[in-house]
């Protein structure tokens, strides 16, 4: 594993700098109808929240249910796709913390081998949430192991780290086939539909990839969804909320409380 000093983060030149102000006016009901899964298709879309990486001096960091993946899972299921979520941080009790091989970091949740064992053999698309840049070295290693064991799986990365540095992670980890930047519901739905039906995904908003000529292709950040009230409810049944409650991890400030996250708005209100 390479040391942190070898990582060089390059800023992304976003084609449209006004993306935060631009809204996606499409209706989710219409997209759910247009991009439905093929009937009786047994292929699976697996979404994954990987383990948390933190300093060895920190016993734990606050962990919460993966709200973003729950919403994404809700959209995909509503469109008829067989969807599973691997929650490496809270999917199995007890929530364990192990030390990294270099003895510098704590890894909170299921390790790479345990995650590999949970991947359905019928998985066609594997979506992984990459949120924080300091976790990249470990999550890159996980992705490489997934591709080695399941070479035919299409791996797509989302989350803040992926959105901020798509070219970097695609070139640093060729095991990643695509990146979805920005809000993923509309993009992931159309992306899945096209792949399931053998169609091109090269022009879908929010998609980034390395083409056959080894050139980076970036379709920009997906627009902000105008009406989040029209999104399907989070697919909490694909997760195990009780594990968080039983381990005393919750959303509220009061220990031992039973609180669930909700979506009231997206993005920073101060831009």
Q: Each predicted region: which residue ranges?
A:
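Radical SAM [4Fe-4S] cluster-binding motif and immediate context
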Residues: 229-230, 234-271
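Residues that mark the start of a beta-strand
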Residues: 42-44, 82, 258-261
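Glycine- and acidic-residue-enriched helix-capping/strand-helix junction motifs
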Residues: 56-69
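Residue-level preference for short coil/turn positions at secondary-structure junctions
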Residues: 40-41, 121-122, 151, 203, ...
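Radical SAM enzyme core and accessory elements
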Residues: 1-47, 121-122
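Short polar catalytic/cofactor-binding loops
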Residues: 49-55
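Glycine-rich beta-alpha loop elements in corrinoid/cobalamin-binding modules
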Residues: 75-76, 82-227
């Amino acid at each position: 594993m390479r040391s942190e000093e070898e990582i060089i983060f390059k800023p992304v030149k976003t084609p449209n700098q006004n993306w935060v102000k631009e809204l996606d006016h499409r209706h989710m009901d219409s997209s759910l109808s247009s991009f439905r899964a093929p009937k009786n298709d047994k292929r699976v879309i697996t979404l994954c929240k990987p383990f948390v990486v933190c300093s060895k001096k920190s016993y734990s960091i606050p962990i919460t249910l993966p709200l973003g993946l729950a919403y994404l899972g809700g959209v995909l299921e509503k469109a008829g796709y067989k969807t599973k979520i691997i929650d490496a941080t809270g999917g199995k009790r007890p929530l364990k913390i192990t030390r990294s091989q270099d003895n510098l970091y704590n890894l909170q949740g299921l390790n790479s081998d345990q995650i590999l064992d949970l991947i359905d053999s019928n998985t066609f698309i594997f979506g992984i949430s990459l949120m924080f840049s300091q976790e990249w070295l470990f999550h890159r290693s996980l992705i490489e192991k997934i591709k080695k064991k399941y070479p035919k799986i299409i791996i797509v990365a989302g989350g803040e780290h992926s959105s901020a540095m798509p070219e970097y992670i695609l070139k640093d980890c060729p095991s990643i086939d695509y990146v979805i930047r920005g809000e993923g519901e509309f993009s992931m739905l159309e992306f899945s539909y096209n792949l399931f039906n053998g169609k091109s995904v090269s022009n879908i908003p929010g998609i980034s990839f390395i083409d056959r000529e080894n050139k980076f292709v970036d379709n920009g950040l997906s627009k902000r969804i105008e009406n989040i009230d029209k999104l399907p409810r989070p697919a909490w049944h694909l997760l195990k909320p009780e594990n968080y409650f039983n381990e005393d991890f919750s959303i509220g400030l009061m220990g031992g409380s039973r609180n669930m996250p909700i979506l009231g708005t997206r993005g920073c209100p101060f831009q």
